[in-house]
Amino acid sequence: MFMINIACLIVPILLAMAFLTLVERKTLGYMQLRKGPNIVGPHGLLQPFADAVKLFTKEPLRPLTSSKLLFMVAPTLALTLALTMWAPLPMPYSLISLNLGLLFILAISSLAVYSILWSGWASNSKYALIGAIRAVAQTVSYEVTLAIILLSILLMSGSFTLTNLITTQEQMWLIIPAWPLAMMWFISTLAETNRAPFDLTEGESELVSGFNVEYAAGPFALFFLAEYANIMMMNALTTLLFLGAHHTPLVPEAYTANFVLKTLMLTATFLWIRASYPRFRYDQLMHLLWKNFLPITLAMLMWHVSLPMSLASIPPQT
């Protein structure tokens, strides 16, 4: 029975990832005054399935000098971790009910760094290794601010439980009192998922394709799926933290529809940003975090710690 529950969670996510690739290609196409994929199926709707068949039926080549085990383990680990992160998300019911749901998500997203590092190192290619090192430095750096922002939000809700966050936001979305945190969180999630304008790991001009340069066929598809699963996961988490997730007092039945709609709007913003902005320079990326975001988030954390204490309204601790 539990396996059926897992399948009911994973299959829709995989389908959503497939169509997200199509939406992205269509969006970029129309923003660049062209059509995008429109041959396979009506209006190109079957393009993701054609891509999947093509990738998974090709021969998975690997470099002769690569580390065989790590080379194959890395993409599998990437997708496994990307899908595991969805388990504690209330939509409106989660697969597993965790008291420390947010901490679990943060820990799993930290582990995802290893799949990137292993893939770059196991490929035995200097392009892949430089791309992997960039990705690790970027991800680890931005996780610092993500963790501090999470802590500030948790001080408002008083619990690590994700369902408590929804209860906290019944009267007001947290994006209103904590809008500077929300802005920094959104930009940090862009960097965390290696998306434009922070996609330095796959800088075509200098790194060919980044850490996955030596991958082809199935393993490449797994990395691709993991990236899009992480994008949707981060947007779902943003919805839970700042946009009140599902609660509409007049229509409580529209829980899941609300949640999905807000997540899709944030995902569309990700695609819009990709179509609009050029890539950052690497030193600018690090400067933005360590010299701008980190001091501001620390100041906001002190503010969120001192405010409840000064007003004698410490949030309920569960």
UniProtKB/Swiss-Prot annotation:
GO terms for biological process: aerobic respiration. It is a multi-pass membrane protein. The lineage of its organism: Eukaryota, Metazoa, Chordata, Craniata, Vertebrata. The gene is MT-ND1. It holds the Pfam family NADHdh. Signal peptide: none annotated. Belongs to the complex I subunit 1 family. The keyword Translocase applies. InterPro entries: NADH_UbQ_OxRdtase_su1/FPO, NADH_UbQ_OxRdtase_su1_CS. Core subunit of the mitochondrial membrane respiratory chain NADH dehydrogenase (Complex I) that is believed to belong to the minimal assembly required for catalysis. Complex I functions in the transfer of electrons from NADH to the respiratory chain. The immediate electron acceptor for the enzyme is believed to be ubiquinone. The chain crosses the membrane at residues 2-22, 69-89, 100-120, 146-166, 172-192, 222-242, 253-273, 294-314. This is NADH-ubiquinone oxidoreductase chain 1. It is found in: Mitochondrion inner membrane. It comes from Tamandua tetradactyla. Coiled coil: none annotated. It is an enzyme of class 7 (translocase).
